[in-house]
Amino acid sequence: MHVDHVVYAVGPAGLAAEAKRFEEALGVKSRDGGIHPRFGTIMRLIPLADDRYLEIVEVLDHPAADKAPYGQAVRARSELGGGWLGWVVAVDDLTPFEARLDRPAVAGLRHFPDGRALEWRQIGVKGLIADPQLPYFITWLSEPGVRPSALKGTVALKNIEIAGKRQRVEDWLGESVPPVFDSVGIDFSSPNGYPGVQSVTFVTDTGEVRI
């Protein structure tokens, strides 16, 4: 399993303003990630080191956002003022998770500004909606050259602080989650509080930044 990316749902300021805030905090530029037409969302991304990235996402006023769980999740987080939506784990095969959750993975599609398409499959967003400490799962279908990991970043993802219980996440993943998981620190706090990602720490050229 690979900690693939973290997702931030924008607040009232909107996508451009939130992306600029991250750019200033991390000292790097974000990129136009295009639209998720099947989910009713639009995003910008910041490439990170170690084949990871930061997704900054905004829901669109589009029927797809009302139907797709991902669009619903982004809208709900944004309506609460915005903040960390969750974390995402990449796997080679979604079949075991489809069997365990008793539903098929859904197809994802994102169009680049230059017209190219990025395709993947994902599952587990409904689990994230019900219990925001849980990551969802993704398998990339497109060639490596168009995946976000092809955009090599200099900022590193160091740590994710999660309100929740380690055992709950381990049961969801089907494997243990040590304090350092795939080279990323996974800290759990507030086991009896509202679950979800509380903060993310990055390592930049000028030091650590906790958001």
What is the predicted role of each segment?
Residues 1-4:
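Extreme N-terminal starter segment of soluble prokaryotic enzymes
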Residues 16-29, 97-100, 165-177:
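Amphipathic alpha-helical segments
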Residues 9-13, 91-92, 160-167:
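Short, surface-exposed ligand-recognition loops at beta-strand->loop->(often short) alpha-helix junctions
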Residues 10, 15-74:
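Glycine/small-residue-rich interface belts in oligomeric ring/scaffold proteins
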Residues 58-97:
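A basic- and aromatic-enriched beta-loop-alpha substructure that forms the phosphate/nucleotide-
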Residues 8-27, 100-116:
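Compositionally biased, low-hydrophobicity segments enriched in charged and small polar residues
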Residues 34, 44-47, 53-58, 86, ...:
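Vicinal oxygen chelate
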